[in-house]
Design a protein with these regions (language model features):
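N-terminal [4Fe-4S]-dependent radical SAM core
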Residues: 14-30, 49-87, 129
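Flexible glycine/acidic-rich beta-alpha junction loops that bind and position SAM and/or redox cofactors
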Residues: 204-209, 265-286, 308-315, 338-348
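Short Fe-S-cluster ligation motifs
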Residues: 121-140, 402-434
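Iron-sulfur (Fe-S) cluster-binding segments and ferredoxin-like electron-carrier domains
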Residues: 101-113, 338-341, 383-414
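C-terminal accessory region of radical SAM enzymes
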Residues: 284-310, 336-387
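Single conserved hydrophobic/aromatic residue that forms the stacking wall/gate
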Residues: 1-8, 13
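N-terminal pre-triad scaffold of radical SAM enzymes
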Residues: 75-104, 119, 123, 128-137, ...
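Radical SAM/AdoMet-radical enzyme domain recognition
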Residues: 119, 123-137, 146-273
Length: 434
């Protein structure tokens, strides 16, 4: 028996014109007043065969359990072997003292022994699972404090990829302070396609929360480093809190002018400042989801973000072939856990022994995501593009993290409609996709 899709959205886009959007199939259908009337009658009427066929083809009418389909798709996506996804922290040390930082900083860098074990693990996994792609996220701490280790390990990973005829790409999360000309060119040569640098505002606004250990500011040095042209896509993340939210527009304008002046192509990404149990920042500075997305939406800062296709995974943490390594060789699922040895589920040495001991309590919550959706998620039309949000926050912090589309659904759907109708144009600086 045919029923209406649980993940379809209906909205009026102009006088006597309606738009249907399906978050599972990604299909859009525009209806005039006559067809809207047919659409409302179609389930009760055996006529309209061609109209029913169109709606069925695009997912607006279904004869199967969509939630069961999403769960099955989630399991298949999590087990997919195409990409071996790795986060590697060559050091957990850092040269900054950011009060909101969630990371577990400590001195020291990755030993040669641990480096060798990780490289051996990558080589073994490629041979065993026939991966088509190795993706590495260089993380920390501040990873560029160990740039020599990145260079050495990246050389060896490139050799593995080349000898097996597969693709290798990587990205770096850095505070940008050490992103010198020499290091930037080294990263270009080692398959780095994306660098994320955080700025919390312009000048002193940034320096109030992102400073060196001696309290000195960092903004000028970071911007000097970002002025260099590069083939790497550089994303500027801005952690927005009650303290700096009114200065986000200033940063946006500053980067537009900066791109024009230096011929760069910096991309801006607004992020809600998070407060973790090991953060020094008080919860009173944190914006709620509603406050955060309302602020961005009312000021047009979501205008270049777009709707994701159905992805069936919330993040790489729930993929079977995804691993995060700290400098000691501890292995984690979530990069927010890296350095917190209590959340490690194994060590690289144990993984190499194949049947090594695994701490089940630290891995099951990430690998069983599809069966942990609560009633609100199960009722939400956005489930296919959100998949329940951050697993770590939901399971360990009992906090919901929703997509911004939830708070501005009509705006997102309309932008997609007008873009695909070739009636909208991009701006000079773009926000990252949600």
């Amino acid at each position: 028996e045919m029923t209406s899709s649980l993940v379809g959205s209906e909205m009026c886009i102009r006088d006597r014109s309606w738009l249907l959007y399906n978050f599972l199939s990604g299909a859009m259908i525009q209806l005039d007043e006559e067809n809207k009337s047919i659409y409302e009658q179609i389930l009760q009427d055996d006529a309209y065969a061609s109209e029913k066929a169109l709606l069925t083809e695009n997912g607006f009418l279904v004869d199967y359990d969509e939630l069961a389909f999403i769960r099955v798709a989630n399991k298949r996506a999590c087990a997919d072997k195409k990409t071996l996804s790795l986060l590697i922290a060559p050091t957990m040390g850092c040269n900054f003292s950011c009060p909101y930082c969630f990371e577990y900083h400590r001195a020291g860098v990755m030993s040669k022994e641990v480096q060798d074990q990780i490289i051996q693990f990558i080589s073994d996994s490629v041979k065993k699972n026939h991966h088509e792609h190795i993706f590495v996220y260089w993380f920390g701490g501040e990873p560029l404090l160990a740039a020599d280790i990145i260079e050495s390990m990246a050389d060896r990973i490139m050799t593995i990829a080349n000898s097996n005829g597969i693709q290798h790409t990587s990205a770096v999360v850095t505070n940008g302070y050490l992103l010198s000309e020499k290091i930037l060119r080294m990263l270009e040569k080692h398959c780095v396609e994306r660098i994320q640098v955080t700025l919390d505002g312009v000048g002193q606004i940034n320096d109030a929360s992102r400073m060196l250990h001696n309290g000195e500011g960092t903004f000028e040095t970071i911007m000097e480093n970002l002025s260099r042209r590069t083939t790497i896509n550089i994303v500027v993340r801005s952690n927005i809190s009650k303290r700096n939210m009114e200065h986000y527009g200033e940063l946006y304008s500053y980067l537009v002018d900066f791109n024009k002046k230096y011929g760069t192509n910096l991309t801006l990404y607004p992020a809600r400042m998070e407060v973790y149990h090991n953060s020094k920042t008080g919860k009173d500075e944190k914006l709620s989801q509603e406050e955060f997305f309302k602020y961005l939406g009312e000021r047009g800062f979501l205008s270049t973000q777009k709707i994701n296709d159905a992805k069936f995974v919330s993040c790489t943490a729930e993929r079977f072939h995804s691993y995060a390594f700290d400098e000691k060789g501890n292995v984690y699922r979530c990069w927010n856990d890296v350095g917190n040895e209590l959340m490690s589920f194994s060590t690289v040495d144990q993984l190499l022994r194949d049947n090594g001991k695994v701490k089940t309590r630290n891995i099951v919550p990430y690998l069983d995501n599809g069966y942990q959706f609560d009633d609100e998620c199960l009722r939400c039309k956005l489930l296919p593009v959100c998949m329940g949000g951050c697993i770590m926050k939901r399971n360990f912090m009992k906090e919901r993290t929703c997509t911004p589309i939830k708070f501005h659904t009509d705006d997102f759907v309309l932008r997609k409609f007008f873009k695909e109708s070739d009636t909208s144009k991009g701006g000079e600086i773009h926000d990252a996709d949600c």
